[in-house]
Amino acid sequence: MFFSKKLQKFNNIKHCFFSRKDGFSKGDYESLNCGLGSDDKKENVLKNLELVSKKIGCKKESLITLNQKHTNEVICFNSDTDVKSKLTGDAIVSKVKNIGIGILTADCASIFFYDPKNKIVGCAHAGWKGALNGIIENTVKKFNE
């Protein structure tokens, strides 16, 4: 697990960047695979998601990930009723408290955003296609809407 010193100074958010270590998956997906869309055993992925949820202090049911497709699409959650998992997109922006948002990466970059004034968090999956097509810019725009 890795933490940003800059983000740790904010007491009202928890964050963490995970590597592939210390999970339950075996073989090609060893070890901390959190991709439900992968060919990994579902029981191992669910155990990995439970582990991640505990580490960041949220319920597994409140950990939101996306069906990432290397796009520039940003999913926004402005209220509890908006929150759904496995929507298609490559970034999440949220004003909703007490949920976890997650981006899954292999060789792409994960980017975490935080606006302490407006209490908005976001994360983006930035592969070369998404970066070239504006995933970072689109995520920042959602913070300003």
Which ranges hold each PLM region?
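Active-site microenvironment for binding and transforming phosphate-containing groups
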Residues: 1-145
